[in-house]
Amino acid sequence: IRQFGSGVVGMPSGSIEEVFRKVESGDAAYGIVPIENSTEGAVNRTMDCLLKTPLFIVGECSIPIQHNLMTRSGSMEGVTRVYSHPQSLGQCVQWLNRNVPSLERLTAESNGEAARLASENPTYAAVAGEVAAKIFGLQIVAANIQDSSTNRTRFLILGREPAEPSANPREDKTSLIFSVPHRAGSLYQALKPFDDFGVSMMRLDSRPAKRGTWEYFFYTDIEGNMSEPKIREALEIFREGCASLKCLGSYPTEKNFRRSDTKGSNL
């Protein structure tokens, strides 16, 4: 709502992959997926989906994340398992170790799925947000169990068409996925044009190429918009040093995001 306004219609999804599918098929106009957390780092499922999707990143937002332990009864009596998304379990690991060390920890596709499982079995608990507790009729046993008081997650906004440059494209962000030849120094040489043209890199993560060899894809955010001559020139030279390159889009950063007319749109 903060990004799109009150006219947006929410469509909950059971997994990150489902969000991509709904936007790709046209069932939803936009999708929102997590990309990185201040405690646990990159969300690998999202990075893998970005590699294959035809969608574009059109915006971003970040929010503080609060996790709660919840059950059907509001009590931990008889509870033997706790479900949550792997990232959420990681963000609460110290609290769980201190307070419920005997619970078996199992992963779910999403925190919403974890809450659904807990709603169907009195021996299950879930780590999820307050909204999930309301949707699935669960009682919060312990609130704000995340280990970091400054826990935040950055989300990407996905669309089928690229975003228009903002009023100040120099403050936009461009996201790329690329691979480099499998030889010494290739990553350094590939990234050198960004330094030569004074383009700031804001993030660099790697993911296995999953081809059975020690090869990787890299995900990076650079400062600026592809509409800028400097960015275009840097990318042209950058492309020469890459084995593959996919541009995920140029888009306004969170502070510069201006919501468009999304009245009646599905999100």
Feature annotation, model-predicted:
Residues I1-L267:
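Domain-level signature for soluble enzymes in the chorismate/prephenate branch of the shikimate pathway
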